[in-house]
């Protein structure tokens, strides 16, 4: 199977007995759920503005200049991408983990360009590492089952 096809192939949820006895399977499921739910929740919030009411302040002007429309329009696009990324993680965590890691890298760059958000950028770097770990664990899990 080609590398691309293998990365996109859906990976099933580990069997209950595997989850009970294998810490690696537990870590895989924990990361899979977290990196599916969090992007979907934050993506939905770009529209609902329940958690944060001023998302555009996190968008670097350099990025906003590349995206048509206002900063708020850009945040709606970002929200749609985040929702899609969460769904991809749920179905294909090996590819989804890489997708979320790349997205987080872009967020980190934007936060550093805006300035004043280095603490959030550092937190997002930790999330980026977790997304990469999810992708690697998904690769190992796909081989075992």
Residue ranges and their predicted role:
Residues 2-145:
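Membrane-interface extramembranous regions
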């Amino acid at each position: 199977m080609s590398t691309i096809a293998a990365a996109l192939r859906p990976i099933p949820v580990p069997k209950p007995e595997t989850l009970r006895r294998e810490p690696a399977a537990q870590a895989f499921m924990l990361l899979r759920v977290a990196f599916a739910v969090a992007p979907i929740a934050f993506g939905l919030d770009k529209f609902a503005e329940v958690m944060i009411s001023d998302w555009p302040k996190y968008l670097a002007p350099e990025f906003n200049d590349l995206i048509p429309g206002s900063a708020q329009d850009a945040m709606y696009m970002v929200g749609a991408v985040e929702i899609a990324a969460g769904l991809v993680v749920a179905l294909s965590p090996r590819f989804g983990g890489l997708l979320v890691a790349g997205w987080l890298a872009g967020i980190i760059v934007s936060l550093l360009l805006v300035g004043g958000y280095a603490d959030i950028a550092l937190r997002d770097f930790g999330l980026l590492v977790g997304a990469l770990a999810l992708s690697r664990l998904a690769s190992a899990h796909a081989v075992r089952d």
